[in-house]
Amino acid sequence: MYAVIKTGGKQYKVVAGEKFKVEQIPADIGSEITLDQVLALGAGETIKFGAPLVAGATVLATVVSHGRHDKVKIFKMRRRKHYQKHQGHRQNYTELQIVSING
């Protein structure tokens, strides 16, 4: 069984037991969180779509770790004007492990 969930403004296709990284969620490591924005559920050939959410469907996940992604370098330049700007960014993330999909 799989589910399509929405968290942090993005959509993820998840399966029970899978680990994946999402935008930072303020939760302690080891705590269980419930993701209730389930957009679709699937099992084999049957697929259940929500409009926009599947009623009564939830995904239970455990917080594995918090961290930061690799640095993204931003370089801006105006030709012939001697203008150069360097900038970097590291986005925070939370790693989750899916415990169960209910619905």
From Swiss-Prot:
Ribosomal protein in keyword set: yes
InterPro entries in UniProt: bL21-like (IPR028909), bL21-like_sf (IPR036164), Ribosomal_bL21 (IPR001787), Ribosomal_bL21_CS (IPR018258)
Keyword rRNA-binding belongs to the record: yes
Gene Ontology process terms (BP): translation
Keyword entries, A-Z: Ribonucleoprotein, Ribosomal protein, RNA-binding, rRNA-binding
A Pfam family it matches: Ribosomal_L21p
GO cellular component labels: cytoplasm; ribonucleoprotein complex; ribosome
Any one GO MF annotation of this record: structural constituent of ribosome
Family: Belongs to the bacterial ribosomal protein bL21 family.
Assembly and binders: Part of the 50S ribosomal subunit. Contacts protein L20.
Entry function: This protein binds to 23S rRNA in the presence of protein L20.
Protein name: Large ribosomal subunit protein bL21
